Curated annotation (Swiss-Prot):
One of its GO terms (biological process) is negative regulation of cell differentiation. Disruption phenotype: Mice die at birth with hypoplastic and intermittent missing craniofacial muscles, cleft palate, absent thymus and parathyroid glands, as well as a persistent truncus arteriosus (PTA) with a ventricular septal defect (VSD). The first arch forms in but the distal pharyngeal arch fails to become segmented, thereby explaining, why the pharyngeal arch derived structures are malformed. Conditional deletion in the skin epithelium leads to delayed tissue regeneration due to progressive depletion of stem cells. It is found in: Nucleus. This is T-box transcription factor TBX1. The gene is Tbx1. One of its GO terms (molecular function) is sequence-specific DNA binding. A motif (Nuclear localization signal) lies at residues 415-426. Pfam families: T-box (PF00907). Expressed in skeletal muscle, lung and testis. Highly expressed in hair follicle stem cell, but not in terminally differentiating cells. The lineage of its organism: Eukaryota, Metazoa, Chordata, Craniata, Vertebrata.
């Protein structure tokens, strides 16, 4: 596929995305914008011969009864038009209609969801844990697809945590929303064969509460609940593909991934579970690796985090390891993560882009496909990537997801209990940063985006987000 005038295409996409944010989704989106309530009319004395007030559903553009050319949908007003759209959803392109998605680490997401998942937001931006990872099926191996995520409010409420009852309570109406953002997977667009080849990880995605963020991070309001949405967009090669924008994407919602955005963890059980299940919470875990059961030792299960960062998006996982310089930088980033959240991230080189497709813990996943629904500059390399020095362990010739157990042993210390989830082994690979132009600070721009995919992505975009809250105390998420 040949792409030209990348900057102009990206500017066009940014404009179309912003213009499409307020448009209704073509399907039944429970988290989309709601139609304002119909007007209320004060009762008044009827005047003989005078027409009465129009019915509420007919406001404000209902034709008179029996008017020529009026249809059932028109006679019921805009609300019924939307209801008709729900009854007759847009027929999806066969390239996306057969796509299905499985959520990885579903058991871990379920455990967090039962407690009430919390995700840290900071001014500098913070990565999610658990990381959103999926396995894709049913794509056309030779067709091009883009993968993106956005976040929509679960409701219009603001919450507070009641420590005496260990529960979340409604604190009032939600804060004003700002135009939403979408996050593109850094390998977009790519062939369906590549996407289906291995597990896709959105470990570059960062959450922030900085309303003035210019790094393309997802802006959220602290103490509000959000639902992540995952979108598959077919890159339509037709010249008039804008006409089919609503047909060329498919949206998936996993309800177990919803969370409350916070500046510091409120529920101590969430804190404990994140420490126990996050292999990089080394400064806070109180168990000795020698006390671990054999099946809970690092390396006993496949990788959770990212690997195979290279210029070639379909590079083999048997590529050489990263350099000593990469390893030192990754270690320094992790050491910063072990400190207080208020310290924030160190300054990173601008326009840093790393390609990532990663394997993860296998597990069954449910999905809720929606018929409708929908970035910015990429953040620095994932803190979860811990690179080894070359030759630190045997090559990965036997299995692409097999990683040495020794990689995590030095991250653990003290004594007590084993973690409830196995900590995976990890072998890193060198990544190659790419300079990347920016066309709009509110959207992620990838050099391989054409107008066809832009139109489909714009149709898929329908989000709200923003936040501003003071930095919190300690937290243990990877950045």
């Amino acid at each position: 596929m040949h792409f030209s005038t990348v900057t102009r295409d990206m500017e066009a996409f940014a404009a179309s995305s912003l213009s499409g944010l307020g448009s209704p989704s073509p399907g039944a989106d429970p988290f989309g914008p709601r139609e304002p309530p119909p007007p209320r009319y004060d009762p008044c004395a009827a005047v003989p011969g005078a027409p009465g007030p129009p019915p509420p559903r007919a406001y404000p553009f209902a034709p008179a009864p029996g008017a020529a050319g009026s249809s059932a949908a028109e006679s019921e007003g805009p609300g019924a038009s939307r209801a008709a759209a729900v009854k007759a959803p847009v027929k999806k392109n066969p390239k996306v209609a057969s796509v299905s998605v499985q959520l990885e680490m579903k058991a871990l997401w379920d455990e967090f969801n039962q407690l009430g998942t919390e995700m840290i937001v900071t001014k500098a931006g913070r990565r999610m844990f658990p990381t959103f990872q999926v396995k894709l099926f049913g794509m056309d191996p030779m067709a091009d697809y883009m993968l993106l995520m956005d976040f929509v409010p679960v409701d219009d409420k603001r919450y507070r945590y009641a420590f005496h009852s260990s529960s979340w309570l409604v604190a009032g109406k939600a804060d004003p929303a700002t135009p939403g953002r979408v996050h593109y997977h850094p390998d977009s667009p790519a062939k369906g064969a590549q996407w289906m080849k291995q597990i896709v990880s959105f470990d570059k995605l960062k959450l922030t509460n900085n309303l003035l963020d210019d790094n393309g991070q997802i802006i959220l309001n602290s103490m509000h609940r959000y639902q992540p949405r995952f979108h598959v967009v077919y890159v339509d090669p037709r010249k008039d593909s804008e006409k089919y924008a609503e047909e060329n994407f498919k949206t998936f919602v996993f309800e177990e991934t919803r969370f409350t955005a916070v500046t510091a963890y409120q529920n101590h059980r969430i804190t404990q579970l994140k420490i126990a299940s996050n292999p990089f919470a080394k400064g806070f875990r109180d168990c000795d690796p020698e006390d671990w059961p054999r099946n809970h030792r690092p390396g006993a299960l496949p990788l959770v985090s990212a690997f195979a960062r290279s210029r070639n998006p379909v590079a083999s996982p048997t590529q050489p390891n990263g350099s000593d310089k990469d390893a030192a930088e990754a270690r320094r980033e992790f050491d910063r993560d072990s400190g207080p959240a208020a310290l924030g991230d160190a300054t990173h080189p601008p326009q840093l882009l790393a390609r990532v497709l990663s394997p993860a813990l296998p597990g069954p996943g449910g999905l809720v496909p929606l018929p409708g629904g929908s970035g910015g500059r990429h953040s620095p390399p994932h803190a979860d990537l811990r690179l080894e020095a070359p030759g630190a362990s045997e090559p990965l010739h036997h299995h692409p997801y097999k990683y040495p157990a020794a990689a995590y042993d030095h991250y653990l210390g003290a004594k007590s209990r084993p973690a409830p989830y196995p900590l995976p082994g990890l072998r890193g690979h060198g990544y190659h940063p790419h300079a990347h132009p920016h066309a709009h600070p509110h959207h992620h721009h990838h050099p391989a985006v054409n107008p066809a995919a832009a139109a489909a992505a714009a149709a898929a975009a329908n989000v709200y987000s923003s936040a501003a809250a003071p930095p919190g105390a300690y937290d243990y998420c990877p950045r």
